[in-house]
Amino acid sequence: MYNPWQVGASLAPARAGPRPFPTPRARPPDCSGGHAPSGFPALGLRTAQRPRPFSSSPRSASGRLRGPRPVARGPAHSSSPTGLPAYLPPAAALDSQTSAPTVSPVTRPRVVARGKTPRVSLAGLETLSSLLHQQQLFD
């Protein structure tokens, strides 16, 4: 049966196993004009330098991290005795002030990418404003 991925499979003698790639051909000569001495490519053509594989991670090809070390900053890593972030008041203080049903505090703020402002949806704004109005009624 003909396999379109086997290039020249009908012409080549039968081999053990499939050959998915054609045999490498000789590279066409550089059309740069002028001769470079002793097999060096002409200046301005960097044939020896391969393009770097694209990767979004800061790790280099050797596996080590490039650039400065990431610094853990902000209240997300604060050490308070309850394990909650330091900027949240303890739940007892909240209970003594208001009789509103207490919402369990978020243990960790959502990490927003640097340089990006967190987007708030319209529904979120409406719920926030309604919650604030409830708080003012309870005070």
Swiss-Prot record:
It comes from the Eukaryota. Residues 1-116 are annotated as: Disordered. Residues 50-70, 84-110 have a biased composition (Low complexity). This is Putative uncharacterized protein FLJ43185.
